[in-house]
Amino acid sequence: MAISKIAFLALIALSGLCGLASATYKVGVGRADITGPPVEINFMGYANIKQVGRGIHTRVFARAFVVEDEKGNRVAFVSADAGMMGYGLKREVIKRLQARYGNLYHTDNVAISGTHTHGAPGGFLMHLLYDISILGFVPQTFEVMAQGLYLCIKRATDNLVDGRIFLSKTTVLNVNINRSPTSYLRNPEEERAQYEHDTDKTLTQLRFVDLENNLLGAFNWYAVHATSMNNTNRLVTSDNVGYAALLLEKEYNPNKMPGKGKFVGAFCSSNLGDVSPNIMGPKCSISGNECDLLTSRCPAGEGECFASGPGRDMVESTQILGQRLADAALGLLNEQSQESTAREVTGDVRFIHQFVDMPNYNGSAYNPLSRKIDKIRGCQPAMGYSFAAGTTDGPGAFSFEQGTTTDNPMWNFVRDFIATPTQEDIKCHEPKPILLATGRATFPYEWQPKIVSDQLLKIGDVIIAAVPCEFTTMAGRRLRNQIRAAASAAGGLDTEVIIAGLTNIYTSYTVTPEEYQAQRYEAASTIFGPHTHSIYMDVFERLTKALMRNETVEPGPSPPYMNDVMLSLNTGVLFDGHPINTDFGYVKTQPEKEYGINDTVKVTYISGNPRNNLFTEKTYFTVERKINEDRWKVAYTDASWETKMIWHRTNTILGFSDLEIYWNISPQTLPGVYRIRHSGEYKYILGGKYPYEGLSHSFTVKED
């Protein structure tokens, strides 16, 4: 009997130890296609009116994870291959979730973050400044994104299983550089001395497994702009981080097409504000000389100041950097058996959210410039002169220079024609000279948000800080430290803080007060003035303390509902036509009879406008391999890295168009007989849309 009691007590003790060592959550992951209209719509990111879509290189996806603790507390996080997120879009996603699940999901426990690709269709942000280069609101983009964001959370919910979560980190070099290094140097020397690099090089991974240790998903946060593809790109692309996600998913979803398979792998944005993937640095495009460090300008005759990546062109640079990120994430996942770098995430799930009226925020904060406690306040939104200069990833127009702290009467006249800043605005934003007084512009609707979304998701001892903008490197480091210290003061030991950038609503950039004085692009785009970062530090410290103490906060004022005032200059598809003696799907250019490794296959079809049907979760074409006389198997789709689809309007009056399909035969391609099939829809001049299909001749890919 005594032995039995001892054994029983030992079992209880062991179970207690096991409870400390591991934690069970309900975890689920999901993915959905959010590819918008691939042609005739401007891309969001570079604000380049000439960057109009002409086809697809890779489709873009939204990837979600859902976590629930033993008490039923639940959070959902989404990383979307999009430039950023708009609150009108999030509000629509919540509406659809609540129509299905009731109040299970709401504003407070759902975070939606953009990867910041600059190669996807725009027109979904519902603020004029961000949609104006897209020629306004694009309902088709908004709808496919809203449904895809909803679907990825729904699929993650449907896939919930008992599981565990592990956190691991690794250093990834040769992927990013600071594109405003002179601004970074404005930060205190003693602060900079705490860090080896002027950008964050740490990749942070959350790994989701079931109770049998089967891998479900991996979400990775790394600070880098998704701007390997520059503003000359016209094909939809998820860019470097999106390609990394495709590689990661391919590894764990063997024999599946891109965007398919149970494993979900994401590369999410972090404090990437001043971080560029163009690691070869900025050079003058004609002379090859280095640009001026302060202004990012080149002398007359030496071209534009442009930074480039490690590849021979932007596509190869995207591929190289995506591979480096994927390799880093795979390295962490492949160590899961030893768990040498990973630690298990334990603890409950919590969330907190607050809307903040930034222009009317008043508080106090430590001023690193004066080294005193100052009263702080937000400003009405405004963009500075250096905003128009662009960045070394994508230069702007006219003669604007980065680092501009003085105004110009001519540009002030243009500014005042749109909206005139008050003297209070001008004083509030100093030393930023105001180029666009967006907070004073109301026609035809709000130009930039005034109310922001600040949110924290706590999963055990991990806190995800969902910020509504692009924090620079040091701005993000300070915020992480502030949240960690606040959590520690409230009893949270060894809290890991992850910054999720461009989340829930978009308000451009946030720099440190010191960086603000330099007025490079990021500072000129810090829309609420020099105290913007200090306000976020104040708000997130307060939210962290409330979160850790399980306290509630006032929800704050909701952003305005603007769905019914949206305007657009984009026209729909009127009709499609085809030349006499042809039909839709007719193959104008057949493939050659034989190809080798590294050759490129090209097939051209008479097509309808791709905007007639987005083929969401499907494909505009397939590359098919012959298995036997009766069976062909899909080898590649329009989501594959190896393929491209380019659409051309050949006759505007008659509505003629061609679709070119390219397949680059990679070394991994199996030899055999192939063909290419195109599916589309055309719009009849008298009304209605009708499907069509075209099929190329078969051709042979020979052994290398």
From Swiss-Prot:
N-glycosylated. Keywords: Glycoprotein, Hydrolase, Lipid metabolism, Secreted, Signal, Sphingolipid metabolism. It catalyses: an N-acylsphing-4-enine + H2O = sphing-4-enine + a fatty acid. Belongs to the neutral ceramidase family. Pfam families: Ceramidase_alk, Ceramidse_alk_C. Its main location: secreted. The gene is CDase. GO terms for molecular function: N-acylsphingosine amidohydrolase activity. One of its GO terms (biological process) is long-chain fatty acid biosynthetic process. One of its GO terms (cellular component) is extracellular region. This is Neutral ceramidase. Its EC number is 3.5.1.23. It comes from the Eukaryota. Hydrolyzes the sphingolipid ceramide into sphingosine and free fatty acid at an optimal pH of 6.5-7.5. Acts as a key regulator of sphingolipid signaling metabolites by generating sphingosine at the cell surface. The active site is at S276. It comes from Drosophila pseudoobscura pseudoobscura (Fruit fly). It is an enzyme of class 3 (hydrolase). Residues 1-23 form the signal peptide. It is found in: Secreted. InterPro entries: Ceramidase_alk, NCDase_C_sf, NEUT/ALK_ceramidase_C, NEUT/ALK_ceramidase_N. Glycans are attached at N230, N362, N550, N598.
